[in-house]
Amino acid sequence: MAKTFKFIFYFWGAFVLVFVLDQWVKSLTLAGLRWQSEYLDLTYALNTGVAFSMLSFLEHNLKYLHLALIVVLFIYLFWQKTLLKTHSIAFGMMLGAGVSNLLDRFIHGGVVDMFFWHKWFNFAIFNVADVMINISVALILIQEIFKKRKKDDRMD
């Protein structure tokens, strides 16, 4: 595989993997999968907002804002290829998760959430896509920190 197209393979591989995994877990949740434990429950919630149900007052208009943000990020990444090459897996994960949640908004009227972490405190209910978005942001930050350290080491 040509080195110049390797990042595209990584991007789309991560995108598809995250999208399929998230939709699969959501389909199990919608089919009635439930589980309770001392720390974590698998349940069902439909989030019509974004994180912590913010912006839920936008109702069905939120899906169009969500769509616009994803389209803008796609365009920016494919225009700014250096950023995409550097963080292809992380952005693939992030956009796969974002598109999966967007699909939920169009099909279900909100995002299907299922994980409820409640040991010591009640945390917001979240889904696989939410976890992948957080992991992708952490990956980008870690890569940037190490890139800066390498650059600083070369300057010394």
UniProtKB/Swiss-Prot annotation:
Keywords: Aspartyl protease, Cell inner membrane, Cell membrane, Hydrolase, Membrane, Protease, Transmembrane, Transmembrane helix
Membrane topology: Multi-pass membrane protein
Stretches that traverse the bilayer: 5-25, 64-84, 89-109, 122-142
UniProt cross-references to Pfam families, sorted A to Z: Peptidase_A8
Localization of this protein: Cell inner membrane
Listed pathway(s): Protein modification; lipoprotein biosynthesis (signal peptide cleavage)
Top-level taxonomic group: Bacteria
Gene Ontology annotations of biological process type: proteolysis
One term under GO cellular component: plasma membrane
Main location: membrane
Any one GO molecular function term: aspartic-type endopeptidase activity
Catalytic residues as annotated in Swiss-Prot or TrEMBL: 113, 130
Signal peptide annotation: none
PROSITE patterns given in the database record: SPASE_II (PS00855)
Catalytic activity: Release of signal peptides from bacterial membrane prolipoproteins. Hydrolyzes -Xaa-Yaa-Zaa-|-(S,diacylglyceryl)Cys-, in which Xaa is hydrophobic (preferably Leu), and Yaa (Ala or Ser) and Zaa (Gly or Ala) have small, neutral side chains
EC number(s) from the headed UniProt entry: 3.4.23.36
Family note: Belongs to the peptidase A8 family.
Protein function: This protein specifically catalyzes the removal of signal peptides from prolipoproteins.
HAMAP family per record: LspA
Name the record gives this protein: Lipoprotein signal peptidase
Organism: Campylobacter jejuni subsp. jejuni serotype O:6 (strain 81116 / NCTC 11828)
